[in-house]
Amino acid sequence: MAHVKRGVIARARHKKVLKQAKGYYGARSRTYRTARQAIIKAGQYSYRDRRQRKRYFRKLWITRINAAVRENQISYSKFMYGLKKASIAVDRKMLSELAIFDNVSFCSLIKSSKDALTSIELNKNL
């Protein structure tokens, strides 16, 4: 049986893993075995956190909108319901940006939301 030498392949694989682990602390960047484990774990974290980031940003936008609408004596849920009834389709990210940077237009959205809510209440009373 022929003698198989695979030093080149193993070295290339180790080099690739150690290159990915560059910047890690201690043995995690120097030894192949721990570097490989660290890279696998880092991949799991990044996969999870790409999904969590979407949740965190949505939570942040809702918090900002809630704080802005409560200054105008309306709750977040009523504000969003009023926008839906007024047929205004603006996503939470844009509402958050408007609340921070363009308060005048955000107040007009609050007003139209309140108007839609009062028209719903008037229809219920009839």
Curated annotation (Swiss-Prot):
PROSITE patterns: RIBOSOMAL_L20. GO terms for cellular component: ribonucleoprotein complex; ribosome. It comes from the Bacteria. SUPFAM superfamilies: Ribosomal protein L20. CDD domains: Ribosomal_L20 (cd07026). Keywords: Ribonucleoprotein, Ribosomal protein, RNA-binding, rRNA-binding. Binds directly to 23S ribosomal RNA and is necessary for the in vitro assembly process of the 50S ribosomal subunit. It is not involved in the protein synthesizing functions of that subunit. Belongs to the bacterial ribosomal protein bL20 family. This is Large ribosomal subunit protein bL20. The lineage of its organism: Bacteria, Pseudomonadati, Pseudomonadota, Gammaproteobacteria, Enterobacterales.
